[in-house]
Amino acid sequence: QKLKEYKETTKRPIWDYMAHYAASGGYMVSMASDKIYANSNTTTGSIGVIMSGYDMSGLYKKLGIRYVSITSGKNKDSSKFTDEQIAIYQDQINEAYEEFVNIVADGRDMSVEDVKKLADGRTYTAKQAKNNGLIDEISLYPDMKDAMSKKLGTSTFYEMESDEGLLQSLFSKAESLVPKSEAQVLT
């Protein structure tokens, strides 16, 4: 919503480039874009909604742990789903799914029916996404910038800085803990 407001306020176009993985919420945020480009190795799509949890009651019983919950209503505690709670959550999931589908239909100028044919939760390769109208072009990032420069007649771009990803952060921290030599192991 904020990206759409930005476009309306500034009258500036938004072009999106998917470098690696832009699925589910990552795909949804692209719907405000005027053009969507993707690297040939990009995975995208995953148009759908999921809610999950664990029923740990069997494990708790084996371990002798008793779970106690005091609530203000019968549907407040969802540690052990009842059929009624499952129905409540399914309604919420269905509502969120319809909203997601409508956002994609609006963003990609497709009919809701056409989006629903693609919106079963699966991911798509860049080629599949392009063939299905989920993205506009497959290219390398510099090629997208060149196309944008030619189309818009400018070489001034505002690019979002990418924060270090969680996995990258974890791996770099783990790597820093690994000894670099036998001497480090012994000290």
Each PLM stretch: what is its role?
Residues T43:
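Short glycine/proline-centered loop/turn elements that form peptide/ligand docking sites
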Residues Q1-M28, S33-N39, I50-T187:
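N-terminal organellar transit peptides
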Residues S46:
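Extracytoplasmic ligand-binding site segments that recognize negatively charged/polar headgroups
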